A protein has these predicted regions:
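Secretory-pathway glycoprotein ectodomains that are cysteine- and/or Ser/Thr/Pro-rich
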Residues: 1-279
Length: 279
């Protein structure tokens, strides 16, 4: 972080400001990644060690986003984000077939919604809606990529060991107390862009769920049914990709040794982004 860049951050009113001479991570657009700056004078070796967790989290998020296939997925699914106070839709995402079956905005007569939400003030309580328009049950996984790049599981949380699929025609909300999700999703933390990824599959994500069960058990009963931060995000995402690969191989697609593949007939991944702003 140079003195010139520090002055630029001051003009942009970025908080907290990093120390001049500190090591930090930046996006391709030269934007500071929140929470990545260290202390002034830190060695490159120490900086790399300190940032290993965040680098893994950013890599995991990137790998998941590479699976986004709303335009090519053959499943009919729709997802949306709404405020709890007033139930206002602020963003939605859907597959091509999901749009034909009726998106949330179409059903409510709302126009102009995209997968990019309006600016959401800190402290706003929101929830996410997912509609299964298929004739078969679907398994739903919802991940949050926070402003600082941390990867967090919003659903399933397996508070009661439940990983039941969403039945045909069913709409669920997240968080949902009936699914063991005992939390309220309030937009908090640092300002910036956050993203929610909704992954739907026709087969259960066995390996990923097993890892979530281990993480949930380690946290104890007091945190049961609350979002799970992935302390080893690369391991979690590789488990997820393995599940998607196994589901694809079981669908009769031609497989290549050593190459993970995803069958768009078996899964769909959608993205909803929103900007966290100050109150």
């Amino acid at each position: 972080v140079t003195s010139v860049y520090y002055q630029q951050l001051q003009k942009l009113k970025v908080t907290p400001l990093p120390e001049i001479g500190s090591l930090a991570l930046f996006s391709l657009a030269a934007d500071l990644i929140p929470g990545s700056a260290g202390i002034s004078g830190e060695s490159v070796t120490d900086g790399v060690k300190r940032l290993q967790g965040k680098l893994k989290s950013l890599l995991a998020a990137r790998l998941v986003k590479l699976t986004l296939n709303a335009t090519s997925a053959r499943l009919s699914v729709a997802a949306a984000m709404e405020t709890v106070d007033g139930g206002q839709l602020v963003a939605e995402s859907f597959t091509v077939r999901g749009a034909k079956s009726g998106s949330f905005s179409q059903n409510r007569g709302v126009r102009g919604l995209t997968s990019n939400a309006q600016k959401i003030k800190q402290g706003t309580q929101v929830q996410f809606l997912v509609q299964n328009n298929e004739l078969v049950p679907l398994y739903i996984t919802v991940l949050l990529i926070s402003v600082d790049g941390t990867l967090c599981v919003l659903s399933p949380l397996l508070g009661r060991g439940d990983n039941s699929p969403v039945t045909p025609g069913e709409k669920i909300q997240i968080p949902d107390p009936n699914r063991g999700e005992r939390y309220k999703f309030k937009v908090e933390g640092e300002t910036g862009i956050a993203e929610v990824l909704v992954i739907t599959t026709t087969t259960p994500l066995t390996k990923a769920v097993e890892l979530l069960q281990v993480l949930a058990a380690e946290r104890g009963d007091s945190l049961r049914g609350t979002p799970v931060d992935l302390t080893q995000p690369d391991e979690a995402i590789f488990s997820l990709l393995d599940d998607l690969d196994e589901g694809s191989r079981g669908s009769g697609t031609n497989s290549l040794p050593g190459v993970r593949q995803i069958d768009t007939r078996q899964m769909a991944a959608m993205s909803i982004t929103f900007e966290v702003v100050g109150m």
